[in-house]
Regions:
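BZIP DNA-binding basic region
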Residues: 1
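Short, low-complexity cationic-aromatic patches
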Residues: 44-58, 96-112
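Short terminal alpha-helical segments
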Residues: 10-71
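Amphipathic alpha-helical binding modules
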Residues: 101-154
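Extended intrinsically disordered, low-complexity coil regions enriched in Ser, Thr, Gly, Ala
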Residues: 59-90, 120-134
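Short hydrophobic short-linear motifs embedded
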Residues: 5-7
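A ubiquitous short alpha-helical element
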Residues: 23-27, 73-77, 96-100
Length: 154
């Protein structure tokens, strides 16, 4: 059987395309596909029609948003993240105990800000930053750390 000769130029071109893609934001259609379930989860919790899944979606969104802010794509304070984390814990406990999956009125504005920030991050941050943030989230999930340590931002 004949062997093909390796052409280093082909692999080099593919690597160059990959490297370039990591520096660019994701396509708008992909950003819309990623943000739509987040908006749906926020709306469900706003209306009192949420679920465990909606709380999990917004927990992951809060963490990803924080990680991307740490990388320089957006602004959130430690206090905002801490308040959001506490609100999610209260919402989850209430939902488990009473079946009522909703945000308190005081937290809707904060989560609207988080979701809007995440939406902007998906449109502007390069793929490399999104990949890094996603890898951080994956590590938290793999470790079973339900309460990751939130870093104070300077």
């Amino acid at each position: 059987m004949a062997k093909t000769l390796p052409f280093p130029g082909g692999n080099q071109a593919a690597r160059a395309r990959q490297a370039k893609a990591l520096l660019l934001p994701i396509p708008r259609s992909m950003a819309v596909e990623l943000i739509l379930p987040v908006h749906i989860a926020l709306d469900a919790l706003r209306r009192g029609a949420g679920s465990t899944s909606a709380v999990q979606t917004l927990t992951q969104t809060m963490l990803l948003t924080g990680f991307l802010c740490d990388l320089g794509y957006g602004e959130m304070t430690y206090e905002q993240l801490r308040t959001a984390d506490q609100a999610l814990a209260v919402t989850f406990e209430r939902g488990r105990e009473s079946g009522e999956w909703r945000f308190d009125e005081a937290h809707i504005e904060l989560f609207s800000y988080i979701v809007s920030t995440y939406d902007a991050q998906l449109q502007r941050a390069p793929l490399s930053a999104l990949t890094d943030a996603s890898a951080q989230l994956d590590r938290i999930i793999a470790n079973g750390d339900a309460q990751p340590t939130l870093r104070k931002q300077a």
